[in-house]
A protein has these predicted regions:
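Short helix-loop capping/hinge segments that flank enzyme active sites or metal/cofactor-binding pockets
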Residues: 72-92, 251-266, 315-365, 369, ...
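Conserved hydrophobic/aromatic pocket- or pore-lining residues that grip, position, or stack substrates
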Residues: 30, 52, 74, 80, ...
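Structural helix-boundary/capping segments
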Residues: 36, 110, 114, 164-268, ...
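An N-terminal boundary/leader segment
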Residues: 1-54, 292-294, 353, 459-464
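Serine-dependent amide/ester hydrolase catalytic core
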Residues: 11-17, 31, 61, 258, ...
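Short, well-ordered beta-strand elements within core beta-sheets of diverse protein domains
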Residues: 12-18, 97-101, 212-219, 344-349, ...
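Short glycine/serine-rich loop/turn segments
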Residues: 72-214, 321, 380-396, 461-462
Length: 464
């Protein structure tokens, strides 16, 4: 039998529904693993162990009586600490909000609870989802379970580290410039940035209003699809939310991909930002594997990463400055150095800069839409390198921008990152799949074809 800490959320939910697994048994195993490993990983800012165990007992009583709340009944979940959980701190990993306690759940948290999931606690993040990894804050940064000397990616760092290490099977992350997909890439898990507007952001502390997304982080494609089914839906309380027909993303995952058209954006990692040779080789292997699975793979071109990056920088930092300006004027010393520097940069962009960036953004959206008119899915790099050491500021800064994730925050298209292999140094390599707006089902289908062929869902760090 699979060890409980490596059990998928889908399998755990099925076992609980069939009365083959007790929610208390699962919670006990995970809390023991958290107690043993988290002092090295720092995935949690606030572990709510007593409340989680009480919720597991209630879930067990309900399951015994055949009363299941939903498809995640009794399954533990971790929440990134920029998302409100009633009665728990929402600190955003910052001194600014260290005493802030939420009075209600974020909509994404409420949806998970309604589906039966049990909140374990709040997870480490880069400060305000932009600064980090930082050592000048009240809480230490999360570390990579594949090698704790290395960065787990960010800003959803605790989410990535905890899922990869088997502390929980699923977590919530947010993605404004790649913050779900970066930890997914560094930690070898599955993370999706859904289509802009598909998942409500109400109750989530904003970084940049027009770029923010909420997304699921899991060890398998099936779990990610199931979690997104729960999270998706229109919320009138989020001005960016879009009303679309609800999809059952977990259905059809095992369909073959014969005839599916995949556009390979080679120039991202070969020309625009030359990748580590191991990353390049891994991406070529993914492309060949999809061809063997029946997909039609061909090269496709988009505007350069430099163009996408320039637009993202102006919009993200301008919008972040608009949010943080009052605190930065009154309490600059309460910010960590990295967050302060990155947000302050937004003060130097003019209204004209912002308008021009938004104008160019429309052209970039049209370019990606046109590419996806020729193919069904795009394949490209996520990170250009394996995870860097966490204690080397120069490496952290260098790898911060060596990625191909921000284009799809700019355009809003759904983008999924997952493991593409393991480096000679024992760290995950990654791939990114991008789809048409609200075509997450196709994205999951392609990701599952790769996962099934490569067995990435069975590769875990050796941390014990």
């Amino acid at each position: 039998m699979t060890e409980l800490h490596w059990m998928t959320a889908s399998a755990a939910a099925r076992a609980i529904a069939a009365k083959e697994l007790s929610p208390v048994e699962l919670m006990t195993a995970l809390l023991a693993r958290i107690e043993r490993l988290d002092p090295r990983l720092n995935a949690f800012i606030h572990l709510d162990a007593a409340a989680a165990m009480e919720a597991a007992r209630s879930a067990e009583v309900e399951a015994s009586a055949g009363r299941l709340r939903g498809p995640l009944h009794g399954v533990p979940v971790g929440i990134k600490d920029i998302m409100d959980v009633a009665g728990l701190p929402t600190t955003c990993h910052s001194k600014i909000l260290k005493d802030n306690v939420a009075t209600s759940d974020a909509v994404c948290v409420s949806k998970l609870r309604s589906a039966g999931a049990i909140v374990l606690g709040k997870l480490s993040t880069h400060e305000f989802a932009i600064g980090g990894p930082s050592f000048d804050l009240p809480w230490p940064p999360a570390r990579n379970p594949w090698n704790t000397d290395h960065h787990p990616g960010g800003s959803s760092s605790g989410s990535g580290a905890g899922v990869a290490a088997g502390l929980f099977a699923m977590a919530l992350g947010s993605d404004t410039g790649g913050s779900v997909r970066n930890p997914a890439s560094c930690c070898g898990i599955v993370g999706i940035k859904p289509t802009y507007g598909l998942v409500s952001r109400r109750g989530v502390f904003p970084l940049a209003f027009t770029l923010d997304h909420v997304g699921p982080m899991t060890r398998t494609v099936a779990d990610n699809a199931l979690m997104l089914e729960v999270l998706a839906g229109h919320d009138p309380g989020d001005p960016g939310s879009v009303a679309v027909v609800h999809r059952r993303y977990a259905e059809g995952l095992e369909r073959d991909i014969r005839g599916l058209r995949v556009g390979f954006i080679r120039h991202f990692h070969e020309v625009d930002m030359p990748a580590d040779p191991e990353v390049t080789a891994a991406l070529e292997h993914v492309a060949r594997t999809l061809q063997l699975e029946g997909a039609e793979v061909r090269d496709i071109h988009l505007p350069t990463l430099v163009e996408f990056g320039a637009v993202n920088r102006v919009i993200l930092q301008s919008e972040a400055w608009a949010i943080h300006a009052p605190w930065l004027r009154e309490r600059p010393g309460d910010y960590g150095q990295l967050a302060r520097r990155r947000i302050l940069a937004g003060a130097f962009f003019s209204a004209g800069d912002y308008v021009q960036a938004q104008r160019r953004r429309l052209e970039l959206i049209a370019a990606v839409d046109a590419a996806l008119g020729e193919v069904d899915v795009l394949l490209c790099a996520s990170s250009m390198d394996p995870a860097c050491r966490i204690d080397n500021p120069a490496d952290v800064e260098r790898t911060y921008s060596r990625q191909a994730r921000t284009p799809f925050n700019i355009t809003g298209h759904p983008a999924l990152a997952m493991m593409a292999g393991v480096s000679v140094g024992g760290l995950p390599l990654s791939v990114q799949f991008v789809g048409r707006n609200f075509a997450e089902a196709t994205l999951f289908q392609v990701a599952r074809a790769w996962e099934r062929a490569a067995g990435t869902d069975r590769k875990h760090p050796a941390i014990v």
